[in-house]
């Protein structure tokens, strides 16, 4: 019996000598990451799933090395509800503030997602000296306009998700490509009553008119609108040859169904929130056919190879959750924890100011392209070359599949005109 106890003692001692960091990682406190997320919304669910996947991968590999010790990540998720109709900004801010104070977090990653809430939240982070990395939504150009005017005050804030200032030039380029190919030049614009939607409308109008388009109609509809038949009749009457849409709400799916049922002779192109979901073909009975959807940050569509990390992310997500990733928010949310891991391990520190400097200096390959930040406003840089920037993506529903058609460097197929639409050429 004594001999057996001695052998066990020797084995345990050997484990301490050979695997000291492994043993330490089992006993140290986790690194707490506060995650403000609108959990009822599609985008919030995208972000939450991808953050959980990254956390599980990092923890399975031993955690994050802080000096000589590896520590696991723990996500403290709070439901901000900012994508739900009627939830005031004050309640969203209160949820974030409560997370900071109750859980003593020094790093936040996630949302808010709604642009108005995201802008208001910027003033919380310098107050409490906590890092915030927005990786779900908040597509308003107002965010980087505000941080860029006073980066010394807003130094704790970073945005890993993209914004319409990046998205729209890509979309306008696609629109002009379609214009030249098919001879179209008349456009109708419809958007939801939200800051980033109206900013998208203004930017598309400006870019398209410069490219030779004529805007034959414009409409802004309230959030949660479900009947678009009157607007679509106006589209038909206007002679529009393209219908540009920007509406992030789940209710916007009704517009696509009605567009298809009414066979509106104008291809639908833009951002219709739920239609990036891989279940949409089945759910709508194929009524999303030929819709061109801006699908957020690149890296979530079948067959993409933006970088060597794109397919591993896609496959890991599908294995973990049983579905292909949707679009908006997924890749930034997966990337954000690897970004933090990189910054913490480079500095060996969890000091907030030290990490701010490290995040500013980030230059890493992600599932969505090359990740770097603009040091003047802390916005992650997006473009059209994955060797230099993060990537956007546009898909078209073709024969039940989500096909990436733009930007050209990551496209897996070409745009197809709906069969009921006639080209002047």
Regions found by a protein language model. Name each.
Residues 259-334, 345-346, 404-413, 418-424:
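Extracellular/periplasmic periplasmic-binding protein-like sensory domains
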Residues 44-66, 202-210:
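Short, polar/charged alpha-helical segment
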Residues 22-34, 65-74, 176-186:
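Immediate post-signal peptide segment of exported/extracytoplasmic ligand-binding proteins
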Residues 28, 43-49, 64-148, 160, ...:
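Beta-alpha junction/loop-to-helix N-cap segments that form part of ligand/metal-binding clefts
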Residues 316-330, 341-404:
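Segments of small-molecule ligand-sensing domains
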Residues 34-52, 78-85, 112, 190-199, ...:
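Extracytoplasmic "Venus flytrap"
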Residues 105-218, 267-293:
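Extracytoplasmic ligand/sensor domains, especially the bilobed periplasmic-binding protein
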Residues 1-32, 100-102, 421-425:
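Short, low-complexity disordered leader/linker segments with a strong preference
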